[in-house]
């Protein structure tokens, strides 16, 4: 029991769990458990209250429901960093902000250049933009105190801004035909959350009630349901009427659940690639190549070049205690898209089948790109932090 407790207290524990459950999914998808795995994810699950009903496959419940909880945590983290952390002052925020912008633009551009002759793949441009913060921080944690604190803060701030970019992309590009009735309910729920915030209500149950209404309304509206999670996170007050911090309390509650349950579950549900159907031609086909090169080449090129030129042009300042070689190592680690890239792939290629060819190819590209980025980033970071 003591060994289990020590494991969960490790900074790298969440990254190790993500890797384990992704590997488990690949094993399931390539053994006699193959049919069980994919059929299990395609089981329809319905929830009904009167005339209101949500009918989704188990895979969609994980991606739309459980991941909404993760995005509540993202909203809480972004708000905390904006109010009191690494994004609270212009001087602190500008360096990782510029780096994050480069890390979104260049991978998308590389993906476009590789896939532009295939219009059916055009929706996938956002896939290599993402960074899996849990996995990236897990790898950094493997090196312990050798990694300077300012470098860890840089990675965290960059990843948070990267998440904000992903939220904007989801809202603008991956929303379906809108339902005015559902959006009206969502607006009322948001008004309720804002009222609770302005009144500095500290009881999280009140936010949970309005949050569930908001999530269901957004799900039915055509806007992706995970955006409800971000809004809920932003509406949790930093201080309540008694001077306590609901924001910190809720973040403290959600962090272990997201790190050790939600994200590993998502990895297990989305990382299953059936390797038996894959050959060399498929590995080097347009979709996986565009995603993999976007992550392996585009991410470090974008993050490093934008941050480097921002310093040279006097826009930003290199944080003290950080070397450019270390910035480049972090830039490579940002190519670990993994769960976030899989999430965006699920939005980009929505055919409703967990084992379709296009989903298999996109997952293959994500796994290849993320694995190479993780290995190269770890080796370079280790060599620059002796």
From Swiss-Prot:
It is found in: Cell inner membrane. One of its GO terms (biological process) is regulation of pH. InterPro entries: Na/H_antiporter_dom_sf, NhaA. Keywords: Antiport, Cell inner membrane, Cell membrane, Ion transport, Membrane, Sodium, Sodium transport, Transmembrane, Transmembrane helix, Transport. The keyword Transmembrane helix applies. It comes from the Bacteria. GO terms for molecular function: sodium:proton antiporter activity. It catalyses: Na(+)(in) + 2 H(+)(out) = Na(+)(out) + 2 H(+)(in). The chain crosses the membrane at residues 10-30, 58-78, 94-114, 124-144, 154-174, 176-196, 199-219, 253-273, 283-303, 327-347, 361-381. It is a multi-pass membrane protein. GO terms for cellular component: plasma membrane. NCBIfam families: NhaA, PRK09560.1, PRK09561.1. Belongs to the NhaA Na(+)/H(+) (TC 2.A.33) antiporter family. Na(+)/H(+) antiporter that extrudes sodium in exchange for external protons. This is Na(+)/H(+) antiporter NhaA. It comes from Mannheimia succiniciproducens (strain KCTC 0769BP / MBEL55E). The lineage of its organism: Bacteria, Pseudomonadati, Pseudomonadota, Gammaproteobacteria, Pasteurellales.
């Amino acid at each position: 029991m003591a060994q289990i407790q020590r494991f969960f207290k490790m900074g790298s524990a969440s990254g190790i769990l993500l890797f384990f459950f992704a590997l488990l999914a690949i094993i399931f998808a390539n053994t006699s458990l193959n049919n069980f795995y994919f059929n299990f994810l395609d089981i329809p699950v319905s929830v009904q209250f009167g005339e209101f009903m949500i009918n989704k496959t188990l895979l969609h419940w994980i991606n739309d429901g459980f991941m909404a909880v993760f995005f509540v945590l993202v909203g809480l983290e972004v708000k905390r960093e904006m109010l009191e952390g690494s994004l609270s002052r212009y001087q602190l925020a500008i360096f990782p902000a510029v780096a994050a912008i480069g890390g979104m633009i260049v991978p998308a551009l590389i993906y476009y250049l590789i896939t532009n002759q295939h219009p059916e793949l055009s929706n996938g441009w956002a896939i290599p933009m993402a960074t899996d913060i849990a996995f990236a921080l897990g790898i950094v944690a493997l090196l312990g105190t050798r990694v300077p604190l300012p470098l860890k803060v840089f990675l965290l701030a960059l990843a948070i801004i990267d998440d904000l970019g992903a939220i904007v992309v989801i809202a603008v590009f991956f929303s379906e035909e809108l339902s005015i009735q559902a959006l009206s309910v969502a607006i009322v729920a948001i008004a309720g959350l804002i009222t609770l915030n302005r009144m500095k209500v500290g009881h999280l149950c009140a936010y949970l009630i309005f949050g569930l209404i908001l999530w269901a309304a957004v799900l039915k509206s055509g806007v992706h349901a995970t955006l409800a999670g971000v809004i809920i996170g932003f509406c949790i007050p930093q201080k309540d009427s008694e001077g306590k911090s609901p924001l910190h309390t809720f973040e403290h509650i959600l962090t272990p659940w997201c790190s050790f349950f939600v994200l590993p579950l998502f990895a297990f549900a989305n990382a299953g690639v059936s390797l038996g159907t894959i050959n060399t031609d498929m590995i080097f086909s347009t979709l996986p190549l565009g995603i993999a090169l976007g992550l392996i080449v585009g991410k470090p090129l974008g993050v490093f070049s934008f941050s480097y030129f921002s310093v040279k042009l006097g826009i930003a300042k290199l944080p003290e205690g950080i070397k450019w070689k270390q910035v480049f190592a972090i830039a490579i680690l940002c190519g670990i898209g993994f769960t976030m890239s899989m999430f965006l792939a699920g939005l980009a290629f929505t055919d409703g089948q967990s084992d379709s060819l296009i989903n298999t190819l996109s997952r293959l590209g994500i796994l290849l790109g993320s694995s190479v980025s993780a290995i190269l980033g770890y080796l370079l970071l280790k060599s620059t932090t002796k």
